[in-house]
Amino acid sequence: MNIPIDRVTQLQDIYIFETAINQTVSNIQKKKKNYFRVSLVLLTLLIISLVWCFSKYKLQQQEFIINNGNNSNIQQLQQQQQLNNLDSTTIYTTNDNGDINFHNDNNNNNNYRDNQSSNQKIEQQTLTALDYSLLFLPSSVLSLSLIFSLIIYFSIDDPFLFITRCNSTLYLFNIYYCFSNKKIMILPKKQLNNNYYSSDNYSNYQQQPQQQPQQQQQYNTGYNQHQYTDENEYNHRGNRLVSNPSSTIQRNKKFDTNNNYNFNNNNYNYNSNFNNNNNNNNINNNNNNTNNSNINIISNNNNNINNNNNIINNNNNNNNNNNINNSAYSNFNNSNGYNYTN
């Protein structure tokens, strides 16, 4: 039993739909804005960290080059000092045994130790893998966080796609959600541009089925009578037909028995139905003719009977007249005394 829906309830339902859609769309937009801001902040921090890393790396390279130049100069000076010290500090001493010993100052040993320490400092100033990792650690962390934020940003539902899904269900109730107005609107009525359903075409369409059986019968008879004689002709199944002097048609491939049987049955059923319709029409015509003949016969018989009755009445009248005349003549003869015959 169809219960009529109140207008107020319809408006309440529409208001509920509007509020729900607007809330979901606003939440989606807020989430997208928040993650977009986060991604922008991470992108700026990543750019700053990369700039700092490259600047730090260049500064360390410059310091390394400067230290190498200073160390090379120091080494040259130390070598010259060693040579000068060797020349100035060599002392010839003689022992009791008469051996000559060369005594160098302790400055030579000290200079050698200084050279070793400077070489160790140069080796320590070169950057290692740990230094590189610490240098690029903040930039790598920021890049990973930026990638995750972008993934989350694009994983959030799009408001346009959400509205299209909502409209796909609202179309069933002849309403839709307008994104620009943010309201539920009624669908406009469809206007048919073609004039197929006009009065003239509809009347012609009603008259067409009366002519279809004759046209279809002519088509079937024409198809059965048609014969292919050309070598490049093909039948309705696509099989090539080759002319033969003994027979008009020779098929390269025989028809399937089932399909041929069904095709012939369809023609037989249609022709039989059409013949039955014609027979029924003929029977109706015969019935009409018999009715007309019976009516004519009955009317003719009635007319003949009436004519016979008229003849009988005329005969009776003649007989009455003759009797009257005879009686009058007899009375006249009797009164005059002589015989008179009619």
From Swiss-Prot:
Positions of the UniProt region annotated as Disordered: 198-220, 311-342
Keyword Membrane belongs to the record: yes
Keywords, comma-separated and alphabetical: Membrane, Transmembrane, Transmembrane helix
Keyword Zinc: no
Gene Ontology cellular component terms for the protein in this record: membrane
Subcellular locations according to the entry: Membrane
Chain coiled-coil ranges: none
Residue ranges of the TM segments: 35-55, 134-154, 161-180
Mode of membrane association: Multi-pass membrane protein
Protein known as: Uncharacterized transmembrane protein DDB_G0284971
Organism: Dictyostelium discoideum (Social amoeba)
